[in-house]
Amino acid sequence: RSVSRGLGDVYKRQVVALCVTLFVQAKDYADYVSPLVGTQSSFELSTGNTYPAISRPWGMNFWTPQTGKMGDGWQYVYTANKIRGFKQTHQPSPWINDYGQFSIMPVTGKPEFEEDKRASWFSHKAEIAKPYYYKVYLAEHDVVTEMVPTERAVMFRFTFPENDSYVVVDAFDRGSSVKVIPGENKIVGYTTRNSGGVPANFKNYFVIEFDKPFTYEATFSNDVQPEKPDGSVPVTLKEGKLEQTDFHTGAVIGFKTKKGEVVHARVASSFISPEQAIRNLKELGGDSFEVLVQKGKEAWNEALGKVEVEGGTLDQYRTFYSCLYRSLLFPRKFYELDANGQPVHYSPYNGETLPGYMYTDTGFWDTFRCLFPFLNLMYPSVNKEIQEGLVNTYKESGFFPEWASPGHRGCMVGNN
């Protein structure tokens, strides 16, 4: 009888331990986070100054819905009611602005490239924003757009109506290139768009692969034509022309779709080379969209779960973890992994491709106070990489950074 009681106690302890383990595993810290916090801001009302950065922790690339015009530092504003595209962004603040950006936008009915004409009305009621996943219904095109990123790649899922459907790729102005490869359902290109702090050879190479053959191909280019009275540039799509290199380029591909038909786009980019962009695309592997969402959620739960808080209200939990999420975005990874899985980076200081780590997009006059001590205490393995990157910055430029984005921006203080 005493042996039975002893075994019973053991089983009870095991059940309790299992329940505790399951409770801990089931905690979704990422679901406390709202990436939309701080987005109700403007040049005149400089408060918050955030955008929904859909990414992995410290990811090389972020993705965001774009409500502002090309080049606008306030690229997503909560009070806006139209989305112009879904943009790869590296912007640390609206004042520093962006670099290496390009955008993707689904449209229906007829191909439209100009950002005002391709834009679609949306409602926050039909918008879901998580750190690892974004979904919105584009009412004017009747298209549901979803995206889930890895550190250097992203998968889009478009749910189209029965219509002539298109996807616009805008490589932005100030020097860009696009090439449509119909036989591979692929678009490749590069953007040189930046706001300073880059060498003369700076490029962000991108590759976009679709899982549906094209029935329409066109490209766009201009060489700084005179602007219209409304500030826009005349747009003429060149059907059948598959390649453009100019001041501002883009591409539009299309296909016939049935009601509810799903089309995926796999996207990656590299600051090193087109070949490295294809290598970075392998981050998606053979995973389905749903598996990538789960992996992204797990990555954020692991990072956010380093800090456990107790005793607050639900709103306080949401505030805390939304702020912690912002603390785990920058400085971002500016390195990539070579064919052997080793870190290598394009140097934003001397334009060379070099071995080792590099992080960027941080202003030391702010971040030296709290962010770096916090990372050193809570995320020492990440902070070790950041410090190695700082040493590489000194080796490649002769200085530690004051404001890096991606290279020296020569503003503010804080490097000594």
Residue spans for each PLM region:
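Accessory carbohydrate-recognition regions in carbohydrate-active enzymes
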Residues: 27-372, 376-416
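Intrinsically disordered, low-complexity segments enriched in Ser/Pro/Gly/Ala and basic residues
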Residues: 1-3, 18, 54, 122
